[in-house]
């Protein structure tokens, strides 16, 4: 094998030596391609696995933790929620519409593969500076393309996209982030797993035909960008949501039978990863007859068939004798279905082309025992330069308030979420635009499931460990503010180039923060994804661990809103304001800096707040609640009253007026009626949570907070109209 070919497959000299040892000979091109894909960062998690192994993954309500297509938790009365978040960053930067659309398609398949009907989608989007003279126009093009791709696929599939977050920073100028989350619901006893066992059991290919789209996608997603990357459009998969809709319905029909042993989505690295993962998990071997693959293009080679990432395809291990029944279901839905192999006990993948053996590879070294790297780490030098920066006001509070409310990181994103169908399936209780977590009703048990997606990259830049812990806490707090109990998380870890020791240090610290927060807050990790090499021309993104927290409220009718719908409601701030301006939005907007050093998270205070919100809501004491996030109480209150029908007369009583922009954790704003005040304050005392009265909601269409005064019309215009103008 010549060195150029090996290098083109991103295989290092050390890895090639391992390949020679595993095979006992030189690999052929097909084998090299398969091993390259399975050992890519995207499939093997070789740089990250050692840090992920420490995550807490168990709890009495966890049915399935990491290692399957998606995580599963018990949501009561025999029902389960199946969910996962993952990235489609690199393809979305190259081809925004197709990249984002297939990102949605992939995550939907991960969920319905487990036997669940998908009932909700969320997304976390990060773009570059839309005001930048050089790249602003291109960033707007990316925003429009990505949003169009997500809405097209989700809407056509009939899956409601009910929430998300969107942020802008120059660190994403060369690498945008597109993280998609899906949640499905099924009976706890009806979950299917990705396994291939039972010698002689048939392996069946189902779904769409295989083309040349997405070739090398897993390897591309395991590398950083440079000028040449702009020509990579052919490696972006093309999605067809209508085929996926048929595939989902066919799979859900199949799951009502007892015809199959296991099923796996063909995602990154296509047929390669699905076959190796199924056999690897089961300790089996497999024979695949590649010439039987349904092909969309003529003249395709075994190499292309094994590595194509054509969408809307699954691999099924059926029970022997039931092949025809399985095929019949997929034919009914107008999909391809063909027996293309069988399970063996050899522990090897045997690849045939017109009955000739063209590839023979041991499965375990490519799946369960793929190489794990221990990359060098070193603390980034920039941390010592930024840690002592202190924030002081340089303009009037009113000026800063207006500047912040119309900033694209804070203002309303109706331009985005209006493109998503959030009400299809008629289960949506609280969707995007209503602040905080999104909520759906579970008709089968009367409960609701709340979910929130969270990632503040600036905080992770300032302190990767505390920043990641804060993301877990913040996502959980948003769920708690709906009245639900946070139960588990899914994570999508977006970082730069792991070959840079400073990036690897950020990653290790981020994992430590997630591990600590999940343990202390009792929200285990049940699924996730790692996206590395988010780097262009040597510049890495800020560390960006996206966290989705999922919680349950036993009675959907008790779901809390985030808006004030009545006058004369008492407005309270819960939790302590500690003057946390490090990595804050106010610092970024006023000083154009991301600096400081974060305070450790007080987990006891965070948990006490969650417990208080849950108990107060169970006792019907609250009218509304919302987590205090970026921009502090100033922005939280502004947004709550912008989406409300009433005005506000509020006073913070802070000694220093800049404190209204403080971003301390473990805080929430609540609204409650005067007759419930005493009972609530007694409860807050019981839980050890400080409650500060800020004022009341009023019938006057006016917003007043300390020295800030605006008419409700001005407030609404700043919040609702700004982004539409900025994105044009």
From Swiss-Prot:
Q: Which GO terms describe its molecular function?
A: ATP binding; magnesium ion binding; phosphoribosylformylglycinamidine synthase activity
- Record-listed E.C. numbers: 6.3.5.3
Q: Sorted alphabetically, which InterPro entries does this protein's record hold? A: PRibForGlyAmidine_synth_PurL (IPR010074), PurL_linker (IPR041609), PurM-like_C_dom (IPR010918), PurM-like_C_sf (IPR036676), PurM-like_N (IPR016188), PurM-like_N_sf (IPR036921)
Show the GO cellular component annotation of the record. cytoplasm
Listed pathway(s): Purine metabolism; IMP biosynthesis via de novo pathway; 5-amino-1-(5-phospho-D-ribosyl)imidazole from N(2)-formyl-N(1)-(5-phospho-D-ribosyl)glycinamide: step 1/2
Catalytic activity from the UniProt record? N(2)-formyl-N(1)-(5-phospho-beta-D-ribosyl)glycinamide + L-glutamine + ATP + H2O = 2-formamido-N(1)-(5-O-phospho-beta-D-ribosyl)acetamidine + L-glutamate + ADP + phosphate + H(+)
The keyword Cytoplasm is assigned to this record = yes
Alphabetized, the UniProt keywords read: ATP-binding, Cytoplasm, Ligase, Magnesium, Metal-binding, Nucleotide-binding, Purine biosynthesis
Amino acids binding Mg(2+) 1: 86, 529
Q: Where does substrate bind?
A: 87-90, 109, 237, 309-311, 531
Q: Which residues bind Mg(2+) 2?
A: 110, 265
UniProt keyword annotation of Nucleotide-binding present: yes
Chain sites annotated for binding ATP: 45, 84, 491, 528
* Active-site residues annotated for this sequence: 42, 88 (proton acceptor)
The principal location of this protein is cytoplasm
One GO term under biological process is: 'de novo' IMP biosynthetic process
Location in the cell: Cytoplasm
NCBIfam families named in the record: FGAM_synth_II, PRK01213.1
Q: Which PANTHER family match?
A: PHOSPHORIBOSYLFORMYLGLYCINAMIDINE SYNTHASE SUBUNIT PURL
Question: What quaternary structure, including any partners, is listed in this protein's UniProt entry?
Answer: Monomer. Part of the FGAM synthase complex composed of 1 PurL, 1 PurQ and 2 PurS subunits.
What HAMAP family has UniProt attached to this entry?
PurL_2 (MF_00420)
The entry's function note states:
Part of the phosphoribosylformylglycinamidine synthase complex involved in the purines biosynthetic pathway. Catalyzes the ATP-dependent conversion of formylglycinamide ribonucleotide (FGAR) and glutamine to yield formylglycinamidine ribonucleotide (FGAM) and glutamate. The FGAM synthase complex is composed of three subunits. PurQ produces an ammonia molecule by converting glutamine to glutamate. PurL transfers the ammonia molecule to FGAR to form FGAM in an ATP-dependent manner.
Q: Which family does it belong to?
A: Belongs to the FGAMS family.
What is this protein's name?
Answer: Phosphoribosylformylglycinamidine synthase subunit PurL
Name the gene.
purL
